[in-house]
């Protein structure tokens, strides 16, 4: 009875060790200004439960907004390594406008995600959609792009990669982005930030919602066609988002099922990406 977990641990140990080493390298690659943004983001996430306990639950929208904006600053700052300012502004603008339009259509028609509505907790709103929501798309799409790039990269120059390969990366990025929603939706519904007209199959969330997220994120990625994405630091952001969400939902917010499901879905993408990245680093560094 004891041997089975021991064998599993023995198999997973080198994988987790390689993953931790890769994450450490990812942290070391952060520039000075990126480390400031990283620190601000991490402090915001870690301090949120403490602030809510001391100041009250009414502070949550402010802490959520601060968490989103600090992660946007971090993700966009990392992209600025390899992207020209105009390209960065153009892509960010496309994501913000497209995400807002998708949400407006979703709220008013029920297409893509099913029938849902935002409460008045998050303000201000435009077209019944809180202004913060498009920024949440912007904060997590780049890390999802890094996951797809790490898993599927064939190390050829991105300009000569086949269209089928770019499409596969868009599909995988959409799935990695959707995995984050297995954490997000149960938490925000429980806090009354939005609600569904008819409770669905996954902790009250319709499965159709996740299909809509995957389709929308895949479409956005295919349109933007992000290239030269700094993989390792954005993988670090994706992985830490998974870890922090798992701890938050599992320990502080009393949602262990969402914590487990999110860890499995989002963690699987992170693990696959880090395995590929660690192998790539090992082969490039030689014996």
Label every model-predicted segment:
Residues 1-18:
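N-terminal amphipathic/basic-hydrophobic helices that include classical n-h-c signal peptides
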């Amino acid at each position: 009875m004891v041997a089975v977990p021991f064998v599993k641990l023995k198999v997973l140990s080198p994988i987790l060790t390689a993953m931790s080493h890769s994450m450490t390298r990812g942290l070391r690659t952060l520039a000075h200004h990126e480390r400031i943004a990283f620190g601000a983001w991490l402090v915001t996430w870690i301090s949120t439960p403490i602030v809510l306990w001391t100041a009250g639950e009414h502070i949550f929208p402010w802490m959520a907004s601060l968490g989103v904006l600090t992660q946007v600053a971090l993700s966009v700052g990392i992209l600025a390594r390899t992207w020209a300012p105009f390209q960065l502004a153009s892509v960010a603008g496309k994501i913000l406008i497209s995400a807002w339009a998708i949400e407006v259509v979703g709220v008013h028609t029920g297409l893509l995600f099913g029938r849902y509505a935002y409460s008045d907790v998050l303000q201000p709103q435009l077209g019944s959609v809180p202004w913060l929501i498009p920024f949440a798309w912007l904060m997590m799409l780049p890390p999802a792009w890094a996951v797809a790039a790490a898993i599927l990269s064939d190390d050829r120059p991105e300009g000569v990669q086949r269209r089928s390969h770019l499409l596969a990366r868009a599909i995988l990025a959409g799935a990695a982005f959707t995995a984050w929603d297995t954490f997000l939706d149960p938490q925000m519904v429980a806090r009354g930030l939005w609600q569904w007209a008819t409770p669905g199959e996954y902790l009250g969330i319709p499965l159709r919602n996740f299909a809509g997220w995957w389709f929308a994120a895949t479409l956005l990625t295919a349109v933007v066609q992000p290239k030269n994405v700094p993989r390792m630091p954005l993988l670090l952001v994706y992985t830490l988002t998974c870890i922090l969400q798992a701890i938050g939902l599992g320990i502080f917010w009393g949602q262990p099922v969402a914590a487990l499901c999110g860890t499995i879905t989002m963690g699987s993408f992170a693990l696959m990406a880090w395995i590929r990245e660690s192998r790539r680093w090992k082969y490039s560094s030689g014996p």
